[in-house]
Amino acid sequence: MKIVHVASELFPYVKTGGLADAVASLAGMLADSGHEVAVFLPGYRAALEHRDAAAAERRYRLKVEMGQQYLSGDVRVFSPRPNLSIFLICREEFFDRRAPYGNGERDYEDNSDRFIFFCKGVVETLRLADMQADVVHAHDWQAALLPLLLREAERRQGGMLAMKTIFTIHNIAFQGIFPRAVFARTNLPDELNSVDGLEYYEQINFMKAGILFADRVTTVSPRYAEEIQTPEFGCGLDGVVQTRESDLVGLLNGVDTKVWNPATDPLLPARYSRADLAGKRVCRAELLKRFGFAPDFDGPVFGMVCRLAEQKGVDLVLANQGFFLSQSCRLIVLGAGELRYETAMKALAARAPNKIALSAKLDEAMSHLIEAGSDFFLMPSLFEPCGLNQMYSQIYGTLPIVSRVGGLVDTVIDADQQPEKGTGLMCEPTSASLLDVLARAMTLFDDKPRYGTVQQRAMAREFGWNVAAAGYERLYRDTL
């Protein structure tokens, strides 16, 4: 099949979260299976500066209609591996910036124009290249206009762009909601500026367009597919999602085991496997040393790697700071995000530098070391569409402590509730429940034979992308 992916992030070119990993892994797995795969990505500064893009060819000039004006751009193309091409939709005014979505404190004010241009640029490139894909797969709100724009282009151009579309919701909390006046910049028919189209409480909602107009809708875990049809987790779009229930499927993300494998991981000071954990002990000592702790500390090490945001349960961790201050344990946090959380975590680390450490930045190598060197991985999310770190943790023999939400339910088994199957520990997304599970973690860690049994069971689990990619292949064929 000829498959086109459209996304705002792609590892290793630009990454702020799991979207980049998921799109890269799925596209790579499909390419390795012999499909002809193209990924469209905004021409961010970081992407253009990546070594893979050094040989990028400027292949097409774009002239994109945006309301009453036309904006120019160009398309640069390179191929980092067989069967995979990367198309960068470039316009310096929109994408030559330090970060993809905002300055750290707020979103860019022109994000609506940036991603309308991006989506329209993809449609125009497909036309210029006469690229008749079997499936166009759009990811999250930044690409959510694609199914509708392709439908309208097909209607105007007599079937030239007749392609099946898939829209994946990676996180329904981020929807691309803008003032209603933005609709004019899309040049879509006026009837779509309504409750049956993009209108959303006197604004417009990009994600709503993807949900309504794609041929099929997916999300990133079976549990999350159920949750987003409820008011508690649907973030105002639960009713819209319910209208597509028969076309909705939850396909669990996988792990790229070429990147995340403790036996081959080049970012670790020592490699290890389920059969030989000596390297994990080396990683643990190095992790403690890097953050200024005694490398031979014999209490549990809790690791946490995440965006510092409300969704990730940072409030719950802060509410339980008394536990980390009073217990013989260490807490190591890697993450950047909302200023209030960075400030609070820095203050906590400064209060107890002999127990708690924070590195407030994105550091891929350190994220690998935390996964390898910790004893437990904290992931007390308020909601979690799929989550990847809980899978990385199990592969690396680090027991995940997770909330009972979304994809975490589909991937972690509580060792207390199911002693013969458990691979981690689970709690409700409340501070009291997190405190209880932290106490359970201390008890489990002290029982070394039992901890070792759960660890072995966790490392034996299979989370490779081969299963997820096969599910998408079936979905693509069913959609054709």
Swiss-Prot record:
<keyword id="KW-0320">Glycogen biosynthesis</keyword>
<protein>
    <recommendedName>
        <fullName>Glycogen synthase</fullName>
        <ecNumber>2.4.1.21</ecNumber>
    </recommendedName>
</protein>
<dbReference type="InterPro" id="IPR001296">
    <property type="entry name" value="Glyco_trans_1"/>
</dbReference>
<dbReference type="Pfam" id="PF00534">
    <property type="entry name" value="Glycos_transf_1"/>
</dbReference>
<dbReference type="Pfam" id="PF08323">
    <property type="entry name" value="Glyco_transf_5"/>
</dbReference>
<keyword id="KW-0328">Glycosyltransferase</keyword>
<dbReference type="GO" id="GO:0005978">
    <property type="term" value="P:glycogen biosynthetic process"/>
</dbReference>
<dbReference type="GO" id="GO:0004373">
    <property type="term" value="F:alpha-1,4-glucan glucosyltransferase (UDP-glucose donor) activity"/>
</dbReference>
<keyword id="KW-0808">Transferase</keyword>
<comment type="pathway">
    <text>Glycan biosynthesis; glycogen biosynthesis.</text>
</comment>
<feature type="binding site">
    <location>
        <position position="15"/>
    </location>
    <ligand>
        <name>ADP-alpha-D-glucose</name>
    </ligand>
</feature>
<dbReference type="InterPro" id="IPR011835">
    <property type="entry name" value="GS/SS"/>
</dbReference>
<dbReference type="InterPro" id="IPR013534">
    <property type="entry name" value="Starch_synth_cat_dom"/>
</dbReference>
<comment type="similarity">
    <text>Belongs to the glycosyltransferase 1 family. Bacterial/plant glycogen synthase subfamily.</text>
</comment>
<dbReference type="GO" id="GO:0009011">
    <property type="term" value="F:alpha-1,4-glucan glucosyltransferase (ADP-glucose donor) activity"/>
</dbReference>
<comment type="function">
    <text>Synthesizes alpha-1,4-glucan chains using ADP-glucose.</text>
</comment>
